[in-house]
């Protein structure tokens, strides 16, 4: 029996802002994502479908076929705007290189920030807890 290795991505989403100035105050921008009153209402299926579409747009049919069998969104929190994506080892490089180009999920215009890429879901949940603890 063969074990399939997996990789996990921890991603934080923020609404796309037209007036964002990266030099103004970076700490307030990080904290604002948690303090906004808008919850992130996206379904895991919509997130996985958006990732598949952007990988196909960037890497073509090969990229879509490589990630289709092992890609799924396993966690999304509407309050902290964090999500976790699971992918097979190997094609995870295609997913990681395509995530910065993701601009919308469903009707939501979002800006993704790749926080962490890990081999175990346990480490991803540790990172998630650290992020929530530091910014709340």
Identify what each model region corresponds to.
Residues 82, 86-93:
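Helix N-cap motif at beta-to-alpha junctions
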Residues 100-110:
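A common structural junction motif
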Residues 22, 91-100:
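Charge-rich, low-aromatic oligomerization/scaffolding segments with amphipathic character
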Residues 17-74, 125:
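Surface-exposed, low-hydrophobicity interaction/linker segments
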Residues 8-14:
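Active-site-flanking beta-strand signature of metal-NTP-handling nucleotidyl enzymes
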Residues 121-136:
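Short, low-order "capping/linker" segments at domain edges
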Residues 2-5, 65-67, 75-79, 88, ...:
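Intrinsically disordered, low-complexity regulatory regions enriched in Ser/Pro/Gly/Thr
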């Amino acid at each position: 029996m063969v074990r399939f290795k997996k990789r996990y991505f921890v991603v934080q989403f923020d609404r796309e802002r037209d007036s964002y100035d990266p030099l103004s105050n970076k700490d307030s921008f990080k904290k604002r994502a948690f303090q906004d009153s808008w919850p992130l209402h996206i379904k895991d299926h919509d997130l996985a479908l958006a990732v598949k579409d952007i990988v196909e747009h960037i890497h073509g049919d090969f990229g879509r076929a490589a990630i289709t069998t092992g890609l799924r969104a396993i966690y999304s929190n509407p309050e902290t705007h964090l999500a976790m994506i699971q992918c097979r080892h190997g094609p995870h490089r295609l997913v990681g290189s395509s995530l910065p180009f993701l601009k919308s999920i469903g009707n939501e215009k979002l800006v993704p920030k790749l926080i962490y890429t890990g081999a175990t879901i346990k480490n991803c949940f540790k990172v998630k807890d650290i992020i929530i603890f530091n910014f709340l």
